[in-house]
C-alpha cells in the first residue's frame, strides 16, 4: 500500500480538456485542473478568488451595447457606449451629464434670420430658411453669422452644452465672452454630423459660425442641451454594432462598421466616422470621415461620359446615359478636362486665384492666356507670374482695372512659368465683385465633386471640392472607391504614420502623417497606398493589427502587409500582401499584446496567437486553446486584453461566461479559467491603469423579473486581498506603519471580535478616539462581491440604495467582517426589498452585492503506485496541507467532491481562530482530508465571496492499493 505526499506547487496551469485527464505522465496535466471557475491565476504560481465588481449603471434603456475604449493617456481615459443609433460617454466611471440651465437659443433651427447677425465679408452669402447655409462665394470671401446669447445670473458659472447638427460641413465655429471671441470654445471645425460641445460661461456668450470656401455648407440646428445624460445620435443600428472596428489618434477615434448584412460583399454600407473629443473631455462629436481627394477607382466605372454645369460651387453632374443611383449620394467623382480655364470671383483684398501653368512656344498661341473681366467693381486685379512654382515667387506683370478682355502673352518659349490673378493688398480693393474668366488651352485640370442629392439616373446635385476647367462632357473620369454604391471599409488601423482602411479585399493607406489625404498625385514615399489583398473569394477584413507588420484577418486567411525588408516602411512601390496563415478569422475584433496578435479562428471556438518567428521571417499562428478544445464551444463573441497586474485575455463566450487566459510566455504560463456571475456577460472592456488595468464587464441580469444590463467595474486586487494587522503593545491612540493605501477605511476590533471604532488611513497611520493595547485592524470594505455597492453611513443596521439588486439575495462585508458566513454548505444572505436590507447589527462602512463561489477540481490523482501506473487502482486521499496567503479563516473549503467538504480548521497552533481572523500567511501541518477509496481520487476546493482566499500550494497525502 504505497503512500506519497504529492506537491501541487503551481496552481496556474489552469483548465485541461477531459480528453487529457489520463495523461498523468505529463507534468502539466498533473498540475492542471478539471474545473477552475472564479479563480484568478497569478504568474508566480498561486491562484486566488477573483475580484468582484462594482455596479456603475445601466446601458441606455438597458439595451445591448458595444464599447470603445478611449485612451488619450493612462490617466486620461473614457468608455464610449454605443447602443441603437446612440452614443454615451463614461468618464471616471460616470456618464457625462448636462446640468439644468434656463439658457435658450431662439430660432435655433434658422427658420428665419431673426436673432442672427450677418457679419459676412468679401462677398460671402448667408441664407436662413429652415437651415443655415453659408457660402464664401468669392475668393477670400467669408460667410459669417453671429449671435449674443443671454445667460441669467443663476446660470452663470454653470456648464452649458450646445447640441449642433451639421448637415453638410465643414463649418468653422467658436464661442466667446466677446463678439467674435473664442474664450469659451476655441475656433474649431465642425464636420458633417452631430456635436455636443460644453463650456462654462461667466456671463453672456457669443456664437460665431463661419465658412470661407466657394461652395455652400449646411447647419441644421443649434440648441442648449437639456439636463440629463449626454446622448449623441449615431448611424449604427444595434445589429451592426458588433462589426465596429476602430483605432485612435489623440482625440479622434476613426470608426469603420462592417456588419451591415445587406452591404456589398466584403464591404459595408456604413460610411466611416470620426468620434471626436474636444477641450476638457466633456465635448464630443460623431461626424463623417470623408476625404475630399480620394481614394479613386483606377478606371471609370461606366461607359457614360460626365460633365458639370458649373466649374465651382453647388452644381449638377450629368451623365450621358443612365448611370447614377440613389446609392451614389456621398460619393466623389474626379473629372479631367484639357485646358486650364476657370471663373474667379474677387470681392476683397488678400485674394488670390489658383495658379495656372504656362509652357510651350508662341506668345500669341500656346503661351497666350485670356482674361475676361465682368461685374460691378472697383479694384486693381494684378496679373502675377512666377518662375519658381505655383506657390511662391510671384511678381506683378500686368494690372486689370476695368471690365475688358486681356490677353497675357508670355514670350519665354519653352520656359515653364505660373500665372495667377490677385488683389494682394487693401489699397488694391475698393468695392464690388469682379468676375474674371480665364481661358488657357494648355495643360489640363482635374476637378473633384461630391454628390449631395440624387435627381435621376443621369443627374445628381454636387458640391465642387476642387475647381473644374470646363463644363463639357469628358470620358476621363474616376469614381471614388467608397460610397453606398461601392461599399465602405470594414476595418481601420493606424500604422507607420498612415491611416489605413480595409474592405472589399483592398487596403487604403493615407498620405504619410495626413490622415484625410488620399491624393494619388502625391509624389515620393509619402504617396497614398492602395493595394488588393487576399486571393480567392472576396473577403471582408474582420480586423487589422499594427504590429511589426500590418496583419489582417479575413474569413479565409491571415495576411501580412509587408515591404521588401522587415524594417523598411511601406510605400506605394514596395507594399505586398502575403498570406501568413490559412486558419481564417471569425468576425471578432483581434487584440494586440506587445508584438503579438490574438485572434479568434474562423470557427469562433478557437483562439490563436500570431507571433513573429525570426527564423521564418514572418508571423506564425499558434493555437492558445489547444489544451481546452471544448471550453469555447459556445463561441467567442468578443476579446479584451488586460496587461496589469498580469496579462489576461478575456474571451466573452456566447453562453454568458468568460474564458480568461492568463499568459506569460517567458514563464510558460498559459492558464485557462472561467469567470461566472449571476448573470450573462455580454462584453469585456479594459482601460489602462497605473498599478492595475481597469476591467469592465457589461452584464445582462434579470432583476426582480426585469432584464437589466449593467456596466460593472472590477475591483483592484489590492481592494480584495489584503493583510490583517494586529496591534499589541502599550496603550496608544496612534497606530503607524499600516500596510494600507491612503484613504482606506479600517475597522478595529478586540480579541472577542467586538467592534471598537472605524478610522481612515493617512500616511500609513490612524488616530484613534480611544487608546488601545490590542486591536485587530481590517479594511472595512471588500471588493469580493459582484454588482456591488460600497458606501459609508451613520451607524445603522439598514443599508439603502440597493434598488439595482431589488429582490436579489446579497452577501455583505461591513466594518471589517463578513455578515455572510457559510455553515453546512449554506451561506447567509439578505434579500433586497424596497432597495434596502437590514443587518443584525449596525454598521458604518459596507460592501453589498451578489455572492459567487469558486470551485476548483484537480485532475486525476493517479500516483503513488508500486506496480506501475496508479490509473484504475483503488486509492484514497487521506490528508492535506495548504500554503495560503491573505485568506479568511472561513474562506476555503476542501473535500473529495463538492458535496463532502470541510472548512479550514478553526484551531491553529493550539488556539481557537478568531471569527474575523484573516490568515496573512498559512503554513501548517497536514490534517485529515474527507477522502474515500476510489479509482478516481480528486481534490475539490471551493471559496465563497466575500471571503478572501489565495492558495499558493496544496500537499495531499495519497494512499494507493495496487492490484496486479
Question: Where are the language model's segments positioned?
Answer:
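Beta-sheet repeat architectures centered on beta-propellers
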Residues: 2-99, 237-240, 536-539, 582-585, ...
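Elongated alpha-helical scaffolds
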Residues: 65, 82-85, 231-273, 552-553
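Autoprocessing Asn-cyclization modules and mimics
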Residues: 96-110, 121-140, 153-155, 228-231, ...
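Extracellular and organelle-lumenal recognition/adhesion modules and their flexible linkers in secreted
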Residues: 99-227, 352-369, 377-382, 387-392, ...
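Edge beta-strands of jelly-roll/beta-sandwich modules across compartments, strongly enriched
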Residues: 215-222, 427-442, 947-961
Amino acid at each position: 500500500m504505497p503512500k506519497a505526499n504529492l506537491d501541487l506547487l503551481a496552481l496556474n496551469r489552469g483548465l485541461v480538456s477531459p480528453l487529457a485527464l489520463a495523461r498523468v505522465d505529463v507534468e502539466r496535466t498533473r498540475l492542471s485542473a478539471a474545473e477552475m471557475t472564479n479563480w484568478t491565476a497569478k504568474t508566480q504560481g498561486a491562484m486566488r478568488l477573483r475580484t468582484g465588481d462594482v455596479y456603475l449603471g445601466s446601458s441606455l434603456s438597458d439595451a445591448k451595447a458595444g464599447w470603445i475604449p478611449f485612451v488619450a493617456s493612462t490617466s486620461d481615459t473614457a468608455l464610449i457606449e454605443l447602443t441603437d443609433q446612440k452614443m454615451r460617454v463614461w468618464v471616471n466611471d460616470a456618464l457625462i451629464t448636462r446640468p439644468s440651465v434656463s439658457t435658450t437659443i431662439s430660432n435655433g433651427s434658422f427658420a428665419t434670420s431673426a436673432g442672427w447677425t450677418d457679419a459676412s465679408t468679401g462677398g460671402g452669402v448667408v441664407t436662413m430658411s429652415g437651415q443655415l447655409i453659408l457660402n464664401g462665394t468669392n475668393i477670400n470671401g467669408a460667410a459669417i453669422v453671429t449671435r449674443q446669447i443671454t445667460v441669467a445670473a443663476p446660470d452663470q458659472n454653470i456648464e452649458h452644452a450646445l447640441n449642433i447638427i451639421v448637415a453638410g460641413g465643414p463649418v468653422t465655429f467658436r464661442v466667446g465672452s466677446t463678439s467674435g471671441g473664442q474664450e469659451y470654445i476655441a475656433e474649431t471645425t465642425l464636420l458633417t454630423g452631430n456635436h455636443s460641445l460644453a463650456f462654462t460661461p461667466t456671463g453672456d456668450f457669443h456664437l460665431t459660425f463661419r465658412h470661407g470656401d466657394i461652395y455652400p455648407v449646411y447647419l441644421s440646428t443649434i440648441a442648449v442641451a437639456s439636463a440629463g445624460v449626454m446622448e449623441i445620435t449615431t448611424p449604427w443600428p444595434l445589429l451592426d454594432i458588433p462589426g465596429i472596428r476602430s483605432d485612435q489618434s489623440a482625440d479622434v477615434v476613426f470608426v469603420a462598421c462592417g456588419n451591415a448584412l445587406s452591404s456589398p460583399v466584403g464591404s459595408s454600407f456604413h460610411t466611416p466616422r470620426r468620434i471626436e473629443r474636444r477641450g476638457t473631455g466633456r465635448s464630443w462629436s460623431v461626424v463623417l470621415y470623408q476625404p475630399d481627394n480620394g481614394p479613386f477607382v483606377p478606371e471609370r466605372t461606366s461607359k457614360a461620359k460626365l460633365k458639370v454645369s458649373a466649374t465651382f460651387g453647388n452644381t449638377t453632374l450629368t451623365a450621358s446615359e443612365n448611370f447614377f443611383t440613389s446609392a451614389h449620394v456621398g460619393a466623389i467623382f474626379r473629372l479631367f478636362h484639357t485646358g486650364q480655364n476657370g471663373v474667379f470671383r474677387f470681392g476683397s483684398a488678400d485674394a488670390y486665384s489658383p495658379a495656372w501653368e504656362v509652357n510651350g512656344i508662341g506668345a500669341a498661341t500656346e503661351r497666350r492666356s485670356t482674361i475676361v473681366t465682368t461685374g460691378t467693381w472697383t479694384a486693381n486685379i494684378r496679373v502675377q507670374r512666377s518662375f519658381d512654382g505655383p506657390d511662391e515667387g510671384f511678381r506683378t506683370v500686368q494690372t486689370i482695372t476695368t471690365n475688358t478682355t486681356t490677353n497675357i502673352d508670355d514670350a519665354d518659349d519653352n520656359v515653364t512659368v505660373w500665372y495667377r490673378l490677385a488683389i494682394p493688398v487693401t489699397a488694391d480693393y475698393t468695392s464690388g465683385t469682379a468676375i474674371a474668366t480665364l481661358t488657357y488651352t494648355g495643360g489640363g485640370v482635374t476637378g473633384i465633386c461630391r454628390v449631395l442629392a440624387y435627381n435621376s439616373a443621369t443627374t445628381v446635385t454636387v458640391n465642387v471640392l476642387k475647381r473644374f476647367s470646363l463644363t463639357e462632357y469628358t470620358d476621363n473620369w474616376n469614381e471614388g472607391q467608397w460610397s453606398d454604391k461601392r461599399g465602405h471599409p470594414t476595418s481601420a488601423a493606424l500604422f507607420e504614420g498612415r491611416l489605413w482602411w480595409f474592405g472589399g479585399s483592398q487596403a487604403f493607406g493615407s498620405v504619410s502623417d495626413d490622415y484625410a489625404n488620399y491624393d494619388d498625385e502625391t509624389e515620393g514615399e509619402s504617396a497614398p497606398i492602395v493595394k488588393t489583398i487576399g486571393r480567392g473569394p472576396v473577403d471582408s477584413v474582420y480586423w487589422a493589427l499594427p504590429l511589426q507588420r500590418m496583419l489582417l484577418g479575413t474569413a479565409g486567411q491571415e495576411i501580412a502587409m509587408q515591404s521588401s525588408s522587415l524594417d523598411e516602411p511601406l510605400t506605394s512601390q514596395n507594399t505586398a500582401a502575403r498570406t501568413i496563415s490559412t486558419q481564417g478569422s471569425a468576425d471578432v475584433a483581434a487584440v494586440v499584446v506587445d508584438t503579438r496578435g490574438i485572434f479568434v479562428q474562423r470557427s469562433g471556438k478557437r483562439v490563436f496567437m500570431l507571433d513573429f518567428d525570426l527564423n521564418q521571417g514572418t508571423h506564425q499562428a499558434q493555437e492558445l486553446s489547444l489544451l481546452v478544445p471544448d471550453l469555447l464551444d459556445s463561441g467567442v463573441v468578443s476579446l479584451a486584453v488586460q496587461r496589469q497586474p498580469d496579462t489576461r485575455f478575456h474571451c466573452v463566450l456566447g453562453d454568458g461566461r468568460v474564458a480568461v487566459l492568463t499568459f506569460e510566455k517567458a514563464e510558460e504560463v498559459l492558464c485557462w479559467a472561467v469567470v461566472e456571475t449571476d448573470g450573462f456577460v455580454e462584453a469585456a472592456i479594459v482601460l489602462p491603469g497605473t498599478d492595475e488595468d481597469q476591467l469592465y464587464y457589461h452584464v445582462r441580469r434579470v432583476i426582480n423579473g426585469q432584464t437589466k444590463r449593467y456596466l460593472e467595474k472590477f475591483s483592484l486586487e489590492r481592494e480584495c486581498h489584503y493583510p490583517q494587522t494586529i496591534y499589541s503593545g502599550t496603550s496608544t491612540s496612534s497606530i503607524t506603519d499600516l500596510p494600507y493605501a491612503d484613504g482606506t477605511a479600517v475597522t478595529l476590533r478586540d480579541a472577542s471580535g467586538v467592534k471598537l471604532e472605524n478610522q481612515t488611513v493617512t500616511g500609513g497611520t490612524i488616530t484613534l478616539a480611544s487608546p488601545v493595547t490590542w486591536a485587530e485592524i481590517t479594511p472595512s470594505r471588500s471588493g469580493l462581491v459582484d454588482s456591488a455597492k460600497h458606501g459609508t453611513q451613520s451607524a445603522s443596521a439598514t443599508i439603502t440604495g440597493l434598488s439595482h439588486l431589488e429582490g436579489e439575495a446579497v452577501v455583505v462585508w461591513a466594518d471589517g467582517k463578513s455578515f455572510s458566513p457559510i455553515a453546512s454548505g449554506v451561506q447567509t444572505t439578505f434579500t433586497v426589498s424596497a432597495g434596502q436590507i437590514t443587518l443584525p447589527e449596525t454598521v458604518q462602512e459596507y460592501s453589498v452585492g451578489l455572492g459567487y463561489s469558486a470551485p476548483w477540481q484537480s485532475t486525476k490523482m493517479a500516483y503513488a503506485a508500486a506496480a506501475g501506473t496508479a490509473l484504475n487502482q483503488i486509492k484514497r486521499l487521506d490528508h492535506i496541507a495548504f500554503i495560503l496567503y491573505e485568506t479568511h479563516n472561513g474562506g476555503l473549503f476542501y473535500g473529495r467532491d463538492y458535496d463532502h467538504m470541510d472548512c479550514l480548521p478553526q484551531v491553529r497552533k493550539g488556539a481557537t481562530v478568531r471569527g474575523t481572523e484573516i490568515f496573512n500567511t498559512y503554513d501548517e501541518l497536514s490534517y485529515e482530508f474527507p477522502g474515500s477509496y476510489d479509482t478516481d481520487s480528486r481534490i475539490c476546493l471551493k471559496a465563497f465571496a466575500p471571503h478572501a482566499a489565495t492558495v499558493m500550494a496544496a500537499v495531499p497525502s495519497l494512499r494507493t492499493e495496487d492490484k496486479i
